[in-house]
């Protein structure tokens, strides 16, 4: 299972929100580029970025920072937040971003996801943020009546790279992932599922690996890393050991 550290951008800073509440902001680093490099140096195989300004207002004020991060890192980067047009998606890919995450637009303009996935196979990720099983949009400010599973089924034939399933009620709380919700998502998804929200301990990561065979192949971690609940190296090691235990014996796995 791949562990993906997160950087949330707000007004040029690296921050974290609690349950998507813009009034509950903790600033962790005023230099997101150095933070991104730190995660890479500590062993991250991919970086997850959320442009909170763009998610809330529909346009970005963080492009200079995003470009600098893309230029500075050698690992692939995925980014979400306010990507609601093909122009914006292409712009980010041109910056050197590996995958773009479509959230609000997936609900409001499903054709956009299908067209982008066809034009850029395996470069488009479906980001579904939900609370109590219903999809939220526009930076989690608006709540829809659409069930998560129903939205996923709409894109069963689209060439998307993955689905990021974020449980808003657990995001930033460190109270553990919503395994029930993730199980439901994995059951209806044809694409790999990446879990997001609630990770607060190494035990939470271990519990999440029970869903790997069901299709949950990655996990995004933010606050737990910033609050030093565990280190990135520790988390990667734990997940690697579990992966090795699940494999048949192979002498090459022994360092």
Curated annotation (Swiss-Prot):
It holds the Pfam family His_biosynth. Its main location: cytoplasm. SUPFAM superfamilies: Ribulose-phoshate binding barrel. Pathway: Amino-acid biosynthesis; L-histidine biosynthesis; L-histidine from 5-phospho-alpha-D-ribose 1-diphosphate: step 4/9. It catalyses: 1-(5-phospho-beta-D-ribosyl)-5-[(5-phospho-beta-D-ribosylamino)methylideneamino]imidazole-4-carboxamide = 5-[(5-phospho-1-deoxy-D-ribulos-1-ylimino)methylamino]-1-(5-phospho-beta-D-ribosyl)imidazole-4-carboxamide. It is an enzyme of class 5 (isomerase). The active site is at 8 (proton acceptor), 129 (proton donor). Keywords: Amino-acid biosynthesis, Cytoplasm, Histidine biosynthesis, Isomerase. One of its GO terms (biological process) is L-tryptophan biosynthetic process. Belongs to the HisA/HisF family. PANTHER family: 1-(5-PHOSPHORIBOSYL)-5-[(5-PHOSPHORIBOSYLAMINO)METHYLIDENEAMINO] IMIDAZOLE-4-CARBOXAMIDE ISOMERASE. This is 1-(5-phosphoribosyl)-5-[(5-phosphoribosylamino)methylideneamino] imidazole-4-carboxamide isomerase. It comes from Prochlorococcus marinus (strain MIT 9211). The gene is hisA.
